[in-house]
Amino acid sequence: MPIYVTKPYLPPKDEYLQRVSDIFDRKILTNQGPEVAELEKTLQRFLGVKHFQYVTNGTVAIQIALRALGITEGEVITTPFSYVATISSILWEHCKPVFVDIEPHNFTIDPNKIEEAITPHTKAILPVHVFGYACDVDTINEIAQRHNIKVIYDAAHTFGA
C-alpha cells in the first residue's frame, strides 16, 4: 500500500484543460506569457513583497542572488544537508562552500557554529530552510550584520518561510 507524503492541489479538470488550451493557442510556452505574469503577481501578494521575479528553478535563483550581490569568489557558509543545487550553485559562481553542521531537532544550519566558520574570505551565509522548518533567521542575520556578510536564504523546502 503506497503512503503518500503529499497530496497535490489540482484545479478542476475543465479549468486546467482550458488554461492549457489557451497556452497552446497563444504559442507562448515560457517566460513572458500571461500565466507567468499572473503567477508573479499572485506570489508577490502571498509573500507580501514589493518585488518578485519568477525563475526556472532554485539553482538559477541562488546563482542570480550571488551575482546580484557581487559574490563571484570567496567562501559561502552553508549546510551539506540540502539538495545538490545549493552547493552546485555556489561552485558554479566560483565560490567555495564551507559546511556547518545542522541542529539535530530540525535539521537546519546550526547558527552557533556559523561564527566559528567565518574567515576573512567569507562573503555570504547561505542557510537552508528544511522540511517546513525555518532557520534561526534572527540569530543568523545578527551574525551576518556583525561581520558585514550577506545572507541568502534557500527556502525551496519551506516556501514562504
Residue ranges and their predicted role:
Residues 67-146, 150-155:
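PLP-dependent aminotransferase-like
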Residues 24, 157-161:
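Active-site region of PLP-dependent enzymes
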Residues 1-72, 145:
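Conserved PLP-binding active-site segment in aminotransferase class I/II-type PLP enzymes
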Residues 10, 60, 131-132, 157-158:
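Short, solvent-exposed loop/turn segments at secondary-structure junctions
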Residues 47, 135, 160:
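Flexible, glycine/small-residue catalytic loop immediately N-terminal to the helix bearing the conserved Tyr-Lys
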Residues 57-60, 105-108, 161:
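Short gly/ser/thr-rich secondary-structure transition/capping motifs
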Residues 7, 102, 161:
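Active-site donor-binding loop signature of nucleotide-sugar glycosyltransferases
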